[in-house]
């Protein structure tokens, strides 16, 4: 995974994520939209043959889009860890 900042202005951040496609882009978009400071979030995969997502975030007021992206990343990580724990528990309880 490689991240390139394409555009950064007050209240707006656009980043390119090389090596990630729709799965990651959609997950990040959905998680960003749960953040109350985010006004708009979207992703684009410019070409179907290349694993590359472009994520755009626009925030409300004085919020920082970089912080919103950081919070979304941490939430995805926490949700994934919770899933692993619950899945492991479910497998153990099945036996």
Per-region residue spans from a language model:
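Protein-protein interaction/assembly regions in multi-subunit complexes
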Residues: 1-95
């Amino acid at each position: 995974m490689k991240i390139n900042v394409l555009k950064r202005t007050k209240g707006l951040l656009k980043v390119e994520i090389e090596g990630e496609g729709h799965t990651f882009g959609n997950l990040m978009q959905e998680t960003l939209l749960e953040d109350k400071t985010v006004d708009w979030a979207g992703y684009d995969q410019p070409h179907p043959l290349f694993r590359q997502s472009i994520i755009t975030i626009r925030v409300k007021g004085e919020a920082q889009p970089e912080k919103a992206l950081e919070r979304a990343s941490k939430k995805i990580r926490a949700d994934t860890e919770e899933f692993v724990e619950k899945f492991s528990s479910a497998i153990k309880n099945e036996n």
